[in-house]
Each structure stands twice: as C-alpha cells, then as structure tokens.
Amino acid sequence: AKERKQGKSNNNKSQNGNADLIIEHADIRKSLLNMKSIIEGERALCFWLSQQTEVSLNHSDQKIKQDASDMVSLMTPVVKSLFSDLGMEITSDAMQIYGGYGYTKDQGIEQLYRDNRITPIYEGTNSVQAADLVFRKLSNKNGNIINKFLDLIKSETNSNNEKIKPFVKEFNNYLEILKKFSEWTIDRSETNRDCLLYTSDAADD
C-alpha cells in the first residue's frame, strides 16, 4: 500500500496528473485500520484468556481458580469461532488490497487465505462451537458465569480511563443487549430448546 501507485485519491491536489499511493485512498486506509484493530483486539483477548488459563491451573485460592476456569470454559468457543472467522476476513481484505496480484502465488496472500480457510472447520466447526455456547455455556450455573463476564467488562468501561469515555455509554448499551439475549437464551433452554437451534445459527454469525 505504501509502494503501489494507482489512481487519484479524493485528497489529491496536484495538477500534474500523477497517481497516488494506494494507501492515500480512503477505502484502503479504512481496510488497513480495520485489520489492525481486529488483530490488536484479538491479541488482547488471547493474552487475557491465556492468563485466565494459567490462573485456573495454578492459583492457590480455590475460588479464584474456579472463577478463572469458568471464564475459560465460557470464552473458549467464542475465541475459537471469532478468531477463525475474523482471520478469514482479514486475509480476504489483504488480498483485496493487493488487487489481482494478491490472487497469485507471488505475494503469499492466497496461501494465507487457504491456510485460514480450515480454521472455521477443524477443532469443532464454528457452528458446533456456537451450539456449545448457546446450549451449554450461557446457561451454565444458571447464567452466573456470563453475568460475571459482563460485570467484568462493565467494571473496565466504567473506570476512569479518559480515552474510552466517549464510547462508554454506547458500549454499555450493547452490554445490556447481550445480557438480555443471554437471559432470553437461558429461559428458552428450559422451555423451548428447539428455538435455540436458530439462536446458535445467529451466534455463529
């Protein structure tokens, strides 16, 4: 993106007709920023889950150990499905940025895309992971685990971090939606499990 020149960006003010680097084009910048944001978010979540795994195995306090184990159990199907789906999205966007050249073997993007394509399939397909989340993990301990997770997130968003304050209100609204969804799912798990088949499809998406 910093080497290839093609077309004129919307901000091109030159009068000589020269093409711009493709990184100057708004859609390319948006794609690169989206990829960067996803990767950094995935890394943060992966590090946190790895830490919880260590705590669940080695902590001396049994309550802390069990709480960490609950978090690992809840988030494992989420992380597996989320990371593999987003991995496909990122490699697809990378190929798009390279253009037709990205479709060839020269740059290796097509190989990365092919390698990523297996990840939603193995270690339990993502639809199986979604069903596990909806049928078992959300209702585990009568929803206490998912509520603990949501409370943990809320405690972070309600901290005194000035950088995230502009986003806190909207983010908390999404947390409430997620909480209502989990409560609805737990209720249906007792009365109408068939409808949860459709819910698991939504969770997979």
Task: Label each residue range with its predicted role.
Residues 198-205:
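Conserved small/polar residues in nucleotide/adenosyl-binding loops
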Residues 30, 34-37, 78-81, 173:
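DHp/HisKA dimerization-phosphoacceptor four-helix bundle of two-component histidine kinases
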Residues 63-64:
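Glycine-rich, mobile lid/loop segments that gate access to catalytic sites or pores
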